[in-house]
Amino acid sequence: MNKIYSLVEDIYKVVATKEIPEDVDLYDEIDKFGEGCKSLMTKLFTEERNDGRKLRMSNIGRDDRYLWNAVNNSDVQEDMTPNTYVKFMYGHLIEEMLLFLTKLSGHEVTDEQKQCEVAGIVGHMDCKIDGVVTDVKSTSTFGFKKFKDGSLAFDDPFGYVAQIKGYAHSEGETKFGWLAMDKQNGHLTYLMYDSDDTQAPVHAKIGYDIEEHIERVKKLVEQPVWPEVCHEVVPDGKSGNQKLAVGCSYCQYKHVCWSGLRTFLYSSGPRYLTEVINEPKVQEVS
């Protein structure tokens, strides 16, 4: 059985050469991949969507006000747009494909969607690859860089570290990692952290006690008053206007936190302005 350190190299090799390891049954894995996609589509189109009104392992690492809103204000969150649903569906299919390629390249995949629980918070890990608790991610080119250079722990707006720390902790493990794909270019990388490695540059960001973190968050969301905003506004270039930070611009509670928010459609995408000194010369939407 191959080791996880050669995972990306082995996947690249198998797709380039079509040389399947002797101990891998190609047609069996293809059948399993097809069944996995079928199961995924069945789940997406038949199960009720989560209303977000509770703490889960997948959101436990998000910013404090986001979590407070998720528990106490979920009825005022923005509706998800159809294209966002398509984007998430596409991401799930990519993740299914990556696990297929992992198995096809001779690596062991176990514990898929295994339920985990820490301090009363429940979640389901993606899997273990070669015994390492692993999350599989499809990312933008920009997001991929953080997995490639190992800087994710320093810029983790979606709480990926806390999520996977919870899964690993429930298994009695300190090592965990992400198999990530740049969905625009097809590049792959594997990032592994070890929360017991005190010499690692990221240790100050990942070495915390996940049970203590969860208990703090559970108390926080029970408070009657919401916490401070997650991110302060930032200048919109040299216009004199102020806009939401990236972490807030993607949040479905931004209009709750920032009353009077105005949205302008730039060629690069929507820009959310909290203060307008100079009116942008682009379309505004309500």
Task: Give the role of each language-model region.
Residues G166, S170-S286:
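Metal-dependent nuclease catalytic regions and adjoining charged, substrate-binding loops involved
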Residues V136-S138, A180:
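Residue-level recognition of conserved beta-strand positions in structured domain cores
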Residues E96-S105, A153-K183:
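Metal-dependent nuclease catalytic cores in nucleic-acid-processing enzymes
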Residues G91, E95, Y160-I164, I210, ...:
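A structural signal for well-ordered alpha-helical scaffolds and beta->alpha junctions
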Residues K87, D156-Y160, V202, I206-I210:
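Residue-level preference for long, well-ordered alpha-helices that form the structural scaffold
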